[in-house]
Amino acid sequence: MPLPSSQNSSSPGVKRKQSTLASFFTKKPQTAQQASVNVVEEKSPAATFDKADNQERAAKKDKALTDDEEDDIVAPAPKRVRTNGLYPASREEIPNSTSTTERPPALTSSQRTERFKFSSSPAVNTGVEGSQAAVELEAGQRQKEREELHHKFVRKLGGADCLIGIGRNAISEATPEEGAEPEDEEEAAPPPPAKGKAAAKKGGSKLTPMEKQVIDIKRKHMDTVLVVEVGYKFRFFGEDARVAAKELSIVCIPGKLRFDEHPSEASHLDRFASASIPVHRLHVHVKRLVAAGHKVGVVRQIETAALKAAGDNRNAPFVRKLTNLYTKGTYIDDAEGLGGPMPAASGGASPATGYLLCITETNAKGWGNDEKVQVGIVAVQPATGDIVYDDFEDGFMRSEIETRLLHIAPCELLIVGELSKATEKLVQHLSGSKLNVFGDKTRVERVLKSKTAAAESHSHVSSFYAGKMKTASAADDAQASSLLQKVLNLPEQVTICLSSMIEHMKEYGLEYVFELTKYFQHFSSRSHMLLNGNTLMSLEIYQNQTDHTTKGSLFWTLDRTQTRFGQRMLRKWVGRPLLDKSRLEERVNAVEELKNPEKTVMVERLKGLLGKVKSDLEKSLIRIYYGKCTRPELLTVLQTMQMIAQEFSDVKSPADTGFASTAINEAITCLPTILEDVVAFLDKINMHAAKSDDKYAFFREAEETEDISDQKLGIASVEHELEEHRSVAGQKLGKKTVEYKSVAGIDYLIEVENSSASIKRVPASWVKVSGTKKVSRFHTPEVIQLMRQRDQHKEALAAACDQAFISLLADIATKYQPFRDSVQALATLDCLIALATIASQPGYVKPEYTDHTCIQVDQGRHPMVEQLLLDSYVPNDIDLDSDKTRALLVTGPNMGGKSSYVRQVALIAIMGQIGSYVPAQSAKLGMLDAVFTRMGAFDNMLAGESTFMVELSETADILKQATPRSLVILDELGRGTSTHDGVAIAQAVLDYMVRSIRSLTLFITHYQHLSSMVHSFADQELRNVHMRFTESGTGTDEEITFLYEVGEGVAHRSYGLNVARLANLPGALLDQARQKSKELEEKIRRRKLAGLVTAVGEVIEGSKDENMIERLISSAEQL
């Protein structure tokens, strides 16, 4: 029956509902009509609307309306109409229902205010309540029917998470109902189920079980970026997601960043921000985060789907735990580490040492301020097991701390307790910037230090090593006991650091590294030359001063190693030149023998062996010791060590090596000693399974544990039952047997053709898994049950295989020391061959060593500049002797090569004591105990110290530490103040160095006045030398040619204007400077001439001054 209101569908008081798909599932917002429409509503449409309502109610008694697709008229819901007019009191009050729309007269302000009323207002006429109730009842019934239709439609589509459900939510959120009260029916409707993190209700604090897990772990590790395993991905949540997105360049889905219910986010965000990475890329992304300086934690699911399904907590979320923590220093889960593959010898990257350094300090006894402090350090390299410790007193310049930080170059610092201001500023300076001297930003962590830290630390360290002493084997008992006793007797500050470091490393599961007491080493053991921090930077030992990479450094020049562990050993050699003459001669003799053409065959054999070593054995061994090694890596390590040991299996004694050098013989003899143990471990492993990382077949059958065998038998039994079940399934289909199919990774599918008669015989209990137009694939109930049993056996087998592998690693770890010794022996051979390669270059000579302190070099060259220059380097001689000329006063023009010359002398001395050949025609070197440099000018703004203050402070440190066996280089001391003060200080320091300390000294200056000091040394302890040059032309055409040769005497001019011209300063400025320079020179010359005339007069008058004649001669030469 057509609706009565169809004729008046165009009436202004009603709206026709559109017949669209959205009408099924979108609740139409019932908004109030505009004032102009409501106020002018006519009687005729209203009467028609009432009539239609009455007819509809009569019709519904006979037939319920079930289809909402027909056109029906919907009046605006007048539940709580807020208009600028009020409801008509009754229908009679509406004038002329048939008249056309008339505009009412304009209302005054008071009238508008009076008529602005709601239906609930007491002023409203209650006569309208009857018709109002009828309208509300009709609207309610219509809404209820629409809701029923909507829920049917949603159920048919498949839930609120389908596309249309999402669309409905979007529409309803985009068009909220304004001014109307919420419908009771809508509130009563059950909310659609949400998935994952979306379960957190908007404006509420309800969290999913997995989110609760993440928050619980995060609260314990607030300083850690957590990577959480969720199914087939690893995910970051909250603030961690933002950090990961920035560092890894991945997408971050917006959401809450904070892990607390903070009002700023909780009110309008219902889930955490998140980012994700694939499982197989975990190690790549973790390495990038760690290299960026973050502390990263990996949270894994520690139960599998099959075991979870069989367990009691099948309905609970997966159990997750923090399984791994990584920082720069503790990242050892990758054989290559953070440094990546072995760089080329000419590469520019700085090799990371990977040291964690713990430091603590206290005021020195008798000092109440921070001027003198007692410092303790412990540095550990988890990737190799090396441990360095020291206890020392430091002055207000903190030069001792700086020296150790630059030598060790830690990638992480652990600070125990509060540091003094001076130390704190030094640490910030060395570790704060991206381009610091360590080559990268250093991670800094801090722990508190209690007042009773010393006693607590000693107790903690003692208990840590107590178990170690009990388990020491009889063979190693004496050595282990002595080493452990040495550890327990460490100084107080070192013990505090050691205790803190043990506790710190427990967090990463690496505390076992401290059980390797054999590798404890004292930093300040005076078995090597001291190179302080200033010297390391000034002489560019590890890094150049331009871009802080290794290219152009001494280490870069000497690094011809083929292995990573050999490279690390050479780095130690370069930073710690030997003081023991016998060890030094032993090393240089080994280099000489390897360089000998007669030994070419043996050397090539060694080079070939080193070339075959592709893995970093030292790091892999420590990973085995920690129990973190992978199966393919273990196979590689053992096979490589077997290859090394077998290469020299015929060597039974040092006489069998074919070399005369003791150092080479000891290294080669050490290699075959591990063969028996390595072969025994390899015999337990299935090579092909280990290569493919097949944990199930990793062990050979004879070596499998009982648990592994039981689980494999269980799997075999289940698979046998599955085979037998084929005939049972075939009988049900009317066949003798059926064949199992595997599709899309799903096994044991029974395939039935849709066109065959067998399809009608498929029992209802069979579960259809997949199908095509031609076939359908099923699982029988028996197959499902047996597959579940098989999966449980597989999971248990995987756990048993992992446990057996960990036990094998523990067995190999008991042989760590002999294996490490053999790797160290191979590293020694690598370093010696690298030095032999350097020695084979033209122009390199074997130095002669003497106990007498001297440096005598003929035609020496700068080792690094020579390699970087395309042109040939101009060689120079040097002759310093503690009994003859101990000091040289070096003068010369700017850019004349003074600094290169003095650096060349120091570098040749250092190379000689490393055990290397040196770039010269001949060299005789004494055993220097230290090289000190004071070069370059910079201020220390953080400490409020000027350039001159830094200059003099460093000079004061040198004067305290230098001995008669030291080489001291002072470059332009005194230039940071006025000329008179600068000359006075420079002269006093130089005199003190030569007369009192008696060090070998190279003193660069532009103060020609100092040249007269040579006359006060009768035995020529001090000599004047200058960098030679030639000048041509005069005035503006004057040109200087640098010869870069050292000559006797003094350079009376510095030719600074020549440098200004090379720097392209404006010509007018140069002319003015040249004029001023001439005026000043003429003025000084006149003064000298006047002094000379006076001196001549005194001589004529019969002065008895013995030095007068020499002064006259000197003055005449200067004129």
From Swiss-Prot:
Provide the primary localization: nucleus
Query: Its Gene Ontology molecular function terms?
Result: ATP binding; ATP-dependent DNA damage sensor activity; mismatched DNA binding
GO annotation terms (biological process)? mismatch repair; mitotic recombination
Which key words are in the record? ATP-binding, DNA damage, DNA repair, DNA-binding, Nucleotide-binding, Nucleus
Q: Which cellular components does GO assign to this protein?
A: nucleus
Q: Give the compositionally biased regions (Polar residues).
A: 1-12, 25-37, 95-111
Superkingdom assignment = Eukaryota
- InterPro entries in UniProt: DNA_mismatch_repair_MutS-lik_N, DNA_mismatch_repair_MutS/MSH, DNA_mismatch_repair_MutS_C, DNA_mismatch_repair_MutS_clamp, DNA_mismatch_repair_MutS_core, DNA_mismatch_repair_MutS_N, DNA_mismatch_repair_MutS_sf, DNA_mmatch_repair_MutS_con_dom
Question: Which positions does UniProt annotate for ATP binding?
Answer: 892-899
The reply on keyword Cytoplasm is no
* Localization per Swiss-Prot or TrEMBL: Nucleus
Q: Where is the composition biased (Acidic residues)?
A: 175-188
Query: Per the record, which residues fall in region Disordered?
Result: 1-20, 25-143, 174-207
Q: Where is the region Mispair-binding domain? A: 201-329
Q: Name one Pfam family in it.
A: MutS_III
Chain intervals with Basic and acidic residues compositional bias:
40-66
**Record family assignment:** Belongs to the DNA mismatch repair MutS family. MSH3 subfamily.
PANTHER family, per database record:
DNA MISMATCH REPAIR PROTEIN MSH3 (PTHR11361:SF122), DNA MISMATCH REPAIR PROTEIN MUTS FAMILY MEMBER (PTHR11361)
The subunit field of the Swiss-Prot or TrEMBL record says: Heterodimer consisting of msh2-msh3 (MutS beta). Forms a ternary complex with MutL alpha (mlh1-pms1).
**Purpose:** Component of the post-replicative DNA mismatch repair system (MMR). Heterodimerizes with msh2 to form MutS beta, which binds to DNA mismatches thereby initiating DNA repair. Msh3 provides substrate-binding and substrate specificity to the complex. When bound, the MutS beta heterodimer bends the DNA helix and shields approximately 20 base pairs. Acts mainly to repair insertion-deletion loops (IDLs) from 2 to 13 nucleotides in size, but can also repair base-base and single insertion-deletion mismatches that occur during replication.
Q: What is this protein called?
A: DNA mismatch repair protein msh3
Organism field: Aspergillus niger (strain ATCC MYA-4892 / CBS 513.88 / FGSC A1513)
Task: Provide the organism lineage as a comma list.
Answer: Eukaryota, Fungi, Dikarya, Ascomycota, Pezizomycotina
